From Swiss-Prot:
It comes from Xenopus laevis. Triosephosphate isomerase is an extremely efficient metabolic enzyme that catalyzes the interconversion between dihydroxyacetone phosphate (DHAP) and D-glyceraldehyde-3-phosphate (G3P) in glycolysis and gluconeogenesis. HAMAP family: TIM_B. This is Triosephosphate isomerase. CDD domains: TIM (cd00311). Pathway: Carbohydrate degradation; glycolysis; D-glyceraldehyde 3-phosphate from glycerone phosphate: step 1/1; Carbohydrate biosynthesis; gluconeogenesis.
Length: 248
């Protein structure tokens, strides 16, 4: 059996209000969840406090982004210190929407990772290729470059989860086949073994994101190098509980 604790993160993105998120949280709190799975919900920054007050202690809270310094004249940004102050213990960094909609580069993402970890926040670090990159046969090159920019900024890997999300499968309804996902996860683990250490390669959780649903989660969860999921749209629905229990 894998010594790695299964990890399921829900990324609510820019969705919900107090009413709908409150209802979702009630559903999650009363749902039966596999105790061997680590569960984290990524709320919009403005609702972090609200979510932490309502979520059961068994469910951790994540921010969806943060900046690379603790405070200052950075209008519209939030810092890991603020995230911690709201009771959140994780942050999602390098999500494909941050990279491709907001133009964040590998270097900036690396700096954010370093600062969040230095403040004691866990990082869900996202990597993944676009459709044209997969079709050009450069998936590994792209994903390894993104991973290197993150790895160069990590001293303690115990607080890092790597999330592989093929960009072409996010919100498109296209899912990588379990075999396609496993292939990239396996190569990522080999990259970590070669470039970081064998110990980290065996312990780091590499989770999959990209149109994960109640219907696709079990077969994906059965792959040896898939240690969980980062779930988008389905994390706003009751089926999120099915996904949490994919390993059950």
């Amino acid at each position: 059996m894998s010594p790695r604790k299964f990890f399921v993160g829900g990324n609510w993105k820019m969705n919900g209000d107090k009413k709908s998120l409150g209802e979702l949280i009630n559903t999650l709190n009363s749902g039966k969840m596999n105790a061997d799975t680590e569960v984290v919900c990524g709320a919009p920054a403005i609702y972090l406090d609200f979510a932490r007050q309502k979520l059961d202690a068994k469910i951790a809270l994540s921010a969806q982004n943060c900046y690379k310094v603790a405070k200052g004249a950075f209008t519209g940004e939030i810092s890991p210190a603020m995230i911690k102050d709201c009771g959140a213990t994780w942050v999602i960094l390098g999500h494909s929407e941050r990279r491709h909609v907001f133009g964040e580069c590998d270097e900036l993402i690396g700096q954010k990772v370093a600062h969040a970890l230095s403040e004691g926040i866990g990082v869900i670090a996202c990597i993944g290729e676009k459709l044209d990159q997969r079709e050009a046969g450069i998936t590994e090159k792209v994903v390894f470059e993104q991973t290197k920019a993150i790895a160069d900024n990590v001293k303690d890997w115990s607080k890092v989860v790597l999330a592989y999300e093929p960009v072409w499968a996010i919100g498109t309804g296209k899912t990588a086949t379990p075999e396609q996902a496993q292939e990239v996860h396996k190569k990522l683990r080999e990259w970590v073994k070669t470039n970081v250490s064998e110990g980290v390669a065996q312990s780091v959780r590499i989770i999959y994101g990209g149109s994960v649903t109640g219907g696709t989660c079990r077969e994906l969860a059965g792959q040896p190098d898939i240690d969980g999921f980062l779930v988008g749209g389905a994390s706003l629905k009751p089926e999120f509980i099915e996904i949490i229990n994919a390993k059950h």
